[in-house]
């Protein structure tokens, strides 16, 4: 917000306090408490920026695997007055340009640049979109992020308000399949290498405590799950074939949770309890070759 008032003759020699507040279309973070987003350019309904060993671009669609969602995440530190840093979780680095910022350089999120600029300022384009720019001492002007028509790189140009300059921070949601249990409910198990929370009301999330003596699983509802924790997803009286989740941070450990999260493929299922449907009773439960819970 820009405070203003008329300066009058009586102000001569007086100290005037000007209070400025920032109104950003996203929440800023600290390194210890990141607020995650997808970072998108609005061209063609959204071109997402993501880092996986470098700065790359793809259409705003679900990652091919849940584990890969982590590479899409961004968070922003700093403030509107001193400058902002855009952090790529995938590269564990910040978006940067060469120190001599010019229209012949491009944006990167890697650590290989010798001498670079990584502090940015934003300007309003719409209620939800903004431009990102920095002052170029080399060009003696501000230069802004600009998505190339090929969407293969972000370069720099004099600040504009077309879609090529318009970026937005989007809630980092993704979908995960649910399976019909034949009893009017839908089920699945879930684990991810990052903290997650539910983003819709179709399905509930549960931790599970196993009593091996009597082969009983007790479910307790939770709102979110920390990285690598196993949880049960259950939609009662539902035919939903997917659930929407979102990446978050700061989720505490699930006390008493017996469900083990596996984020890779298993080739040996010996001794593992797997969610399924009994071919004898049709009941949904966790099964091994010789027992069930």
Residue ranges, per PLM feature:
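Surface-exposed interfaces of beta-sheet-rich extracellular modules
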Residues: 1-5
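Extracellular glycan-recognition/adhesion modules and their associated mucin-like linkers
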Residues: 16-54, 68-104, 119-150, 159-173
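A short, polar beta-strand/turn micro-motif
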Residues: 22-30, 169-199, 221-293
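Short, flexible beta-strand-to-coil junctions
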Residues: 39-45, 87-94, 102-104, 134-139, ...
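Short secondary-structure capping micro-motifs at structural edges
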Residues: 73-74, 82-85, 210-223, 227-230
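A short, surface-exposed interaction/processing loop segment used at functional sites
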Residues: 106-114, 150-160, 292-293
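Acidic, glycine-rich flexible loop segments
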Residues: 108-139, 266-292
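Extended, compositionally biased repeat/scaffold regions that form elongated interaction surfaces
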Residues: 119-120, 196-215, 271-276
